[in-house]
Regions:
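Positively charged n-region of N-terminal signal peptides that target proteins for export
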Residues: 1-4
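Short, exposed beta-strand-loop hairpins at the edges of beta-sheets
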Residues: 117, 124-127, 133-147
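Short beta-strand segments that buttress and anchor functional surface loops
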Residues: 32-37, 110-117, 136-138
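Bacterial N-terminal signal peptides
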Residues: 8-16
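N-terminal helix-cap/turn-to-beta initiation motif at the start of protein domains
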Residues: 19-31
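Short, solvent-exposed loop/hinge segments that bridge or flank secondary-structure elements
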Residues: 29-59, 67-100, 126
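Signature of long, low-cysteine stretches enriched in small and polar/charged residues
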Residues: 96, 100-117
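Acidic glycine-/aspartate-rich tracts in secreted/extracellular proteins
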Residues: 65-68, 142
Length: 154
């Protein structure tokens, strides 16, 4: 009898620990709030981006602008994106899970690019998800810029 109770307690503890670990890592898909990190609006919520998966690869598109008119177009974008509406535009593409987990940042995704619609430039990208926090880092050669995005709960 004592052995059965002990085994039951061990299973409950293990499942609870596993659930906590999975929640801490989080899931990438969903709605995320970006924060302006430059200029006069620094520190203000800037936009909502929808991160979505297609065939195991993640992308992000603009869902809503919070500091600009909803009909704003990408004046600084290059090629086919120039003059296109920002709402619905895919800014991040080809992000794949690496299998690495950083103890501070969480589960890592890499291999893709992120485009900054303010200047129209694209950068190599790595992201880490941990719970309701997403760390986004764009790289240009040995230089990088990091932003934190926050999950928007429906």
């Amino acid at each position: 009898m004592k052995k059965a109770v002990l085994i039951t307690l061990m299973v409950v503890f293990a499942l609870g620990f596993l659930g906590t670990t999975l929640r801490a890592q989080g899931t990438l898909a969903g709605l995320w709030k970006t924060i302006a990190d430059e200029g006069p609006d620094k520190g203000k919520a800037k936009s909502y981006l929808e991160l979505f998966e297609k065939d195991g690869v993640f992308f992000a598109r603009i869902n809503k602008l919070l500091l600009e008119p909803q009909d704003k177009v990408c004046d600084n974008c290059k090629g086919a994106l120039k003059g296109k509406p920002l709402i619905g535009m895919v800014l991040m593409s080809d992000m794949k899970k690496t299998g690495k987990i950083d103890k501070d940042f969480g589960e890592e995704y890499a291999g893709g690019e992120i485009m900054d619609p303010d200047n129209g430039k694209s950068y190599r990208c790595k992201i880490w998800v941990k719970g309701d926090n997403l760390t986004v880092r764009g790289y240009l050669a040995m230089f990088h810029r990091t932003q934190n995005w926050y999950r928007v709960n429906p």
